[in-house]
Amino acid sequence: MNGENTLMITVCGVSVAALLLATFPAFALDSNAIGRSTAAPDVVLAKIGDFCGIAAWHPAIEKCTLSADGKVRTLALKGGGVINERLEKRDDAAHSYSYSIIDGPLPVANYLSTISVAADGAGSKITWIGKYDAKGASDAEAMKVIDGVYQGG
């Protein structure tokens, strides 16, 4: 292979790598909360695994309405405000689901969160993890808001 072909392959390889990196968002921030329950994972998942069941266990949610296809939930917040969220992935075998925020008053963009339940001795460990960028607020303020949402649930 001559030098010109090697240069062309190198340039193409770098271009492909840059394109791949550009297609995956780099989240600036993350929040998480871990809770424990004496109940078995299946019991816990029955309570928190219903995508629109959040109104039954999160004190900030007044009402949840689910779209006909079950993929979008509209959350009416106590005190006013609405958040629309999309179910991105559900894995019942792994006791988890992931969702994104479509729109709402939270100071975040590119938000993706996963709630999962795992066996923990005779009980369960509940993990709520979110990755996002701050929008219209500082990183610290966005993290404070999302951390508060997670701790409240």
Pin down the residues of each PLM region.
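A conserved amphipathic terminal alpha-helix motif
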Residues: K125-T127, K131-G153
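Hydrophobic ligand-binding cavity/cleft-lining segments
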Residues: F24-L66
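Residue-level marker for the onset of beta-strands and adjacent loop->beta junctions
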Residues: S31-A33, A60-E62, K71, I83, ...
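Extracytoplasmic/secreted envelope proteins and their assembly/folding machinery
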Residues: P41, L45-F51, H58, N84, ...
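Hydrophobic pocket/interface hotspot
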Residues: V44-I48, I54, R73, L87, ...
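Bacterial N-terminal signal peptides
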Residues: G13-T23
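Bacterial N-terminal signal peptides that target proteins for export
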Residues: N2-V14
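Hydrophobic-ligand binding "helix-grip"
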Residues: L66-S67, A76-G123, K131-D133
